[in-house]
From Swiss-Prot:
The gene is Cplx4. It is a lipid-anchor. Weakly binds to the SNARE core complex containing SNAP25, VAMP2 and STX1A. One of its GO terms (cellular component) is synapse. CDD domains: Complexin_NTD_CPLX_III_IV (cd22809). This is Complexin-4. A lipid is attached at residue 157 (S-farnesyl cysteine). One of its GO terms (molecular function) is SNARE binding. Belongs to the complexin/synaphin family. Present specifically in the retina (at protein level). Expressed in the outer nuclear layer of the retina (at protein level). Strongly expressed at rod photoreceptor ribbon synapses (at protein level). Not expressed at conventional amacrine cell synapses, nor at cone photoreceptor ribbon synapses (at protein level). Weakly expressed at cone photoreceptor synaptic terminals (at protein level). Not expressed in the brain (at protein level).
């Protein structure tokens, strides 16, 4: 009961702003050492803090790397489709150290797209497009043109 009354009075004094409650905090809280609060020795707590800082740095580095990879992909797509460049993406790539490449899966997809585009631009790609046309019509036109040329040549040249 005495604790309850003492606690209520100290809270009222704190609210008034006289600052009489600072001594009570020390008595109630025990130590203000965070290591003791977590049940560790000082050395264990320092080692724990170092590990936490290292893990945070690794996570931040991985996050920055992922952001830079995404920015690299956006830059690649902007180049491919001739869109305006973004300063924000270039800044992200520079923050990561300029050694950023596309992720492996995306690189495979980009390579496949480039291969497909090269095939379409090549002669074989054009021939495959011709297969989609009506070959009978093309043959008839070619034969008609050939016979016309042959007839005009026979008329002009008496040797044939």
């Amino acid at each position: 009961m005495a604790f309850f009354v003492k606690n209520m009075i100290s809270n009222q004094v704190k609210n008034l702003g006289f600052g009489g409650g600072s001594e009570e905090k020390k008595e109630e809280g025990g130590t203000s050492d965070p290591a003791a609060a977590k049940g560790m020795t000082r050395e264990e707590y320092e080692e724990y803090q170092k590990q936490m800082i290292e893990e945070k740095m690794e996570r931040d580095a991985a996050f920055t790397q992922k952001k830079a990879e995404r920015a690299c992909l956006r830059v690649h797509l902007r180049d491919k489709y001739r869109l305006p460049k973004s300063e924000m993406d270039e800044t992200q790539i520079q923050l990561a150290g300029d050694d950023v490449d596309l992720p492996e899966d995306l690189r495979k997809m980009v390579d496949e797209d480039q291969d497909e585009e090269e095939e379409k631009d090549s002669i074989l790609g054009q021939l495959q497009n011709l297969q989609n046309m009506d070959l009978d019509t093309i043959k008839e036109k070619a034969q008609a043109t050939f016979t016309e040329i042959k007839q005009s040549a026979e008329q002009k040249c008496s040797v044939m």
